[in-house]
Amino acid sequence: MQVSIACTEHNLKSRNGEDRLLSKQSSNAPNVVNAARAKFRTVAIIARSLGTFTPQHHISLKESTAKQTGMKYRNLGKSGLRVSCLGLGTWVTFGGQISDEVAERLMTIAYESGVNLFDTAEVYAAGKAEVILGSIIKKKGWRRSSLVITTKLYWGGKAETERGLSRKHIIEGLKGSLQRLQLEYVDVVFANRPDSNTPMEEIVRAMTHVINQGMAMYWGTSRWSAMEIMEAYSVARQFNMIPPVCEQAEYHLFQREKVEVQLPELYHKIGVGAMTWSPLACGIISGKYGNGVPESSRASLKCYQWLKERIVSEEGRKQQNKLKDLSPIAERLGCTLPQLAVAWCLRNEGVSSVLLGSSTPEQLIENLGAIQVLPKMTSHVVNEIDNILRNKPYSKKDYRS
């Protein structure tokens, strides 16, 4: 969109210049006038062609592969930010389920495997996840410019003014996150959920402010509806502010519609990309719950009673049966079921990055292996998976065709 606007301005300037030139030379030689017209027509044609060429060129740069690690990198939406197609999330694990030593080991494995994206939030472990993440980055001495650090704002504290997406909390909340992370800025700050109590203009203005102040490079949304994202974009364009570049959404074999139907439309219309989380559905797809809920699993924790109920429900049993049917496909491809599930998420080109949540180095190494499975995700394999799942969502375009 920026290119097309620039081209339009260029055309207007060219047209004004053409008028001035023609008025000066109209009484002289007609051949000079014709030459000038031809020149400006050529400039206009080139400018218009750039407007159509640039998006195609952008798409051609969408994915690249690191030679040493094999990690793939994609643009975050239609922004210029390059993110590893696999990122490391810190929900539940950092500051909670795992020790600080294990957290450091996980980050080291991820970084050495080519992962540059690390995601956290002010609410994770009441801010402790940010503290651990920042301490590890400082200890390791990794170049800040080689990292993409993202955090999310909404639930900051118990006071009314310490949560939500008011201008006050966005600015104060991000300052608090930066202090815990020991960083000068984050690459992307996310609104962790919509806030019906705050006007959209106030949210967009606050996000624009923290970016202009150098506290963040970009901003995005998490668990927002397509309509809410479009409203934020419209407000940003109306008042010459900065629109969101990405939506964080849940995406896995059993949760598909938003990422496969709604977000692609937003990507093509306004450039908003998808960063997805929970590729293993909170561990449901890992295979560990095939025979009940193990004592050491996430579903066994008191605060995850909802997950346990989901697993033992009738729908949960149906999902486990489908996973058993998918196992032969994984065996044929020479991978594990979790690797198949992560590679299935990555095969969606509309997904900029998939956030992994691992509690052990072994789990992380296994999930990172999905990169090697990705080339095997042919249309035939994807159709096989769809035939087993029987939950493929269809867009309006699909129905029309």
UniProtKB/Swiss-Prot annotation:
Active-site residues, Swiss-Prot/TrEMBL: Y124 (proton donor/acceptor)
Subunit organization: Homotetramer. Interaction with tetrameric potassium channel alpha subunits gives rise to a heterooctamer. Identified in potassium channel complexes containing KCNA1, KCNA2, KCNA4, KCNA5, KCNA6, KCNAB1 and KCNAB2. Part of a complex containing KCNA1, KCNA4 and LGI1; interaction with LGI1 inhibits down-regulation of KCNA1 channel activity. Interacts with the dimer formed by GNB1 and GNG2; this enhances KCNA1 binding. Interacts with SQSTM.
Annotated tissue distribution: Detected in brain, in hippocampus and striatum (at protein level). Predominantly expressed in brain. No expression found in heart, skeletal muscle or kidney. In the late embryonic and early neonatal brain, highly expressed in hippocampus, cerebral cortex, caudate putamen, colliculus and cerebellum.
Entries under CDD domains matching the protein: AKR_KCAB1B_AKR6A3-like
Annotated positions binding NADP(+): 90-91, 97, 119, 192, 222-223, 248, 277-282, 288, 298, 357, 359, 363, 366-367
Subcellular location: Cytoplasm; Membrane; Cell membrane
Family matches, as PANTHER family: HYPERKINETIC, ISOFORM M, VOLTAGE-GATED POTASSIUM CHANNEL SUBUNIT BETA-1
Record text about domains: The N-terminal domain of the beta subunit mediates closure of delayed rectifier potassium channels by physically obstructing the pore.
EC category name: oxidoreductase
Pfam family, one: Aldo_ket_red
Membrane association type: Peripheral membrane protein
Record NCBIfam families: Kv_beta
Principal subcellular localization: cytoplasm
Protein name as catalogued: Voltage-gated potassium channel subunit beta-1
Gene3D superfamilies the UniProt entry points to: NADP-dependent oxidoreductase domain
Phenotype reported upon loss of the gene: Mutant mice show subtle defects in learning. Such learning impairments are not detectable in older mice and are not observed when mice are kept in a stimulating environment.
Reaction equation(s) it catalyzes: a primary alcohol + NADP(+) = an aldehyde + NADPH + H(+); a secondary alcohol + NADP(+) = a ketone + NADPH + H(+)
Domain of life: Eukaryota
GO cellular component: cytoplasmic side of plasma membrane; cytosol; potassium channel complex; voltage-gated potassium channel complex
Function: Regulatory subunit of the voltage-gated potassium (Kv) Shaker channels composed of pore-forming and potassium-conducting alpha subunits and of regulatory beta subunits. The beta-1/KCNAB1 cytoplasmic subunit mediates closure of delayed rectifier potassium channels by physically obstructing the pore via its N-terminal domain and increases the speed of channel closure for other family members. Promotes the inactivation of KCNA1, KCNA2, KCNA4, KCNA5 and KCNA6 alpha subunit-containing channels.
A GO term for molecular function: molecular function inhibitor activity
UniProt keyword Transport, yes or no: yes
